[in-house]
């Protein structure tokens, strides 16, 4: 199935049902009190993470989604039925962003996690709510409020521990094939990898991590050169980045210039991403003699003024790949657990305060001394007014 990692959709929550104006009409009760019921709340729209999905392609073709409207209230104090919520299934790792405000509504990182993206309208109040000692036959009601309407940008961001960076044909796909069972396409031309690939690495029994391979970057990617930088977002959740560098480029280019170009594109896209731990990995070391290899590595490290970790591997021959995988496993295990976002932090929705405000208005007209039990005894006494 085609890999689609971004889609724009429009979600509309259901409107709230309106309240009802109605009065009791029963035999021997000529002056029945109000019995109009409230409307039902409108259905809300939720996103739910599903581990069985791995693309947003369905939302490229189906862009408009509506939740049910709440039913209107009816007589005899019958409350309208609430609208059914709409649940949209998305892949794990999806982020929802409001297109108008650019506000991030939340991330779905675990299977079954739900996120409210459009809140249903609040129900209208029936005339029973407005009865008082001075207004025994109220004809007031309130209408249900409209449901929330949002334009959402869904962004699928892969969940991986290790991310691979590098120029096209640096050997990233070959490396992921050598350390995992993933089988991305490998060929001798640039941009063989067109979509991100994931692989599970198990360096020791009972220990594993996920590695992500994205299409190669070239200089000017931030301006749209090559495949651009749209796939860099898949590395934002990685805990460490491997900068794969071709020690002997077939085009004769200088690896130093290639490394600087990659770092420059990384900083243009996201300073936060550029600040993540990054290891320098020299690939295709089997193409050079041992003495020549060491001289070239020392020169590149010196010119880059590199202070971090440096590793030499041959992904094709699987030389040094297992040792690198073990180092990565130890590094990931030593990292502190990621700080989760505050689960109590909620997005403000349009009608969050409507219920409270409406109830305050009703309470202003309500008389505590009034008996709100409208039974037959209330009408057995004839009131006579004398001048």
UniProtKB/Swiss-Prot annotation:
One GO MF term attached to the UniProt entry: GTPase activity
Give GO terms for biological process.
ribosome biogenesis
Where does the Obg domain start and stop, copy by copy?
Answer: 1-159
Q: Which UniProt keywords apply?
A: Cytoplasm, GTP-binding, Hydrolase, Magnesium, Metal-binding, Nucleotide-binding
Q: How does it assemble?
A: Monomer.
Protein family per UniProt: Belongs to the TRAFAC class OBG-HflX-like GTPase superfamily. OBG GTPase family.
Query: By its UniProt entry, which HAMAP family does this protein fall under?
Result: GTPase_Obg
Q: What does this protein do?
A: An essential GTPase which binds GTP, GDP and possibly (p)ppGpp with moderate affinity, with high nucleotide exchange rates and a fairly low GTP hydrolysis rate. Plays a role in control of the cell cycle, stress response, ribosome biogenesis and in those bacteria that undergo differentiation, in morphogenesis control.
What protein name is recorded for this chain? GTPase Obg
Source species of the chain: Shewanella loihica (strain ATCC BAA-1088 / PV-4)
Taxonomic placement:
Bacteria, Pseudomonadati, Pseudomonadota, Gammaproteobacteria, Alteromonadales
């Amino acid at each position: 199935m085609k890999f689609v990692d971004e889609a724009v959709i429009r979600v509309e929550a259901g409107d709230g049902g309106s309240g009802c104006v109605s009065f009791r009409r029963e035999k021997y009760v000529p002056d029945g009190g109000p019995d109009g019921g409230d409307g039902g709340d409108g259905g809300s729209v939720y996103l739910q993470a599903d581990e069985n999905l791995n693309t947003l392609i369905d939302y490229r073709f189906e862009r408009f989604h509506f939740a049910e409207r709440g039913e209107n209230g009816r007589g005899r104090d019958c409350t309208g039925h609430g609208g059914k919520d709409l649940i949209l299934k998305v892949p794990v790792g999806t982020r929802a962003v409001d297109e108008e405000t650019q506000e991030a509504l939340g991330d779905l990182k675990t299977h079954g996690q739900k996120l409210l993206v459009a809140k249903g309208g609040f129900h209208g109040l029936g005339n029973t709510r407005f009865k008082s000692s001075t207004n025994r036959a109220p004809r007031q009601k309130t209408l249900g409020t409209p449901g929330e309407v949002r334009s959402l940008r869904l962004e699928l961001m892969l969940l991986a521990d290790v991310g691979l960076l590098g120029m096209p044909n640096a050997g990233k796909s070959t490396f992921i094939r050598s350390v995992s069972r993933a089988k991305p396409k490998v060929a001798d031309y640039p941009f063989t990898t067109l979509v991100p690939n994931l692989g599970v690495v198990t360096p020791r029994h009972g220990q594993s991590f996920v590695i992500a391979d994205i299409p190669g970057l070239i200089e000017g990617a931030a301006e749209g050169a090559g495949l651009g930088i749209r796939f860099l977002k898949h590395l934002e959740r990685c805990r460490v980045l491997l900068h794969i560098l071709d020690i002997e480029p077939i085009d004769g280019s200088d690896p130093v210039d290639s490394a600087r170009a990659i770092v420059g594109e990384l900083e243009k896209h996201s300073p936060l991403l550029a600040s993540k731990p990054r290891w320098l990995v020299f690939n295709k070391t089997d193409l050079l003699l041992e003495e020549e290899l060491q001289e070239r590595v020392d020169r590149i490290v010196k010119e880059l003024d590199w202070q971090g970790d440096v590793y030499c591997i041959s992904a094709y021959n699987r030389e040094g790949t297992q040792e690198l995988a073990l180092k990565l496993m130890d590094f990931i295990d030593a990292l502190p657990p990621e700080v989760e976002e505050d689960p109590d932090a909620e997005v403000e929705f349009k009608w969050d305060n409507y219920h409270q405000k409406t109830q305050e208005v009703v309470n202003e007209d309500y008389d505590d001394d009034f008996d709100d039990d409208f039974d037959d005894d209330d009408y057995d006494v004839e009131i006579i007014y004398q001048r």
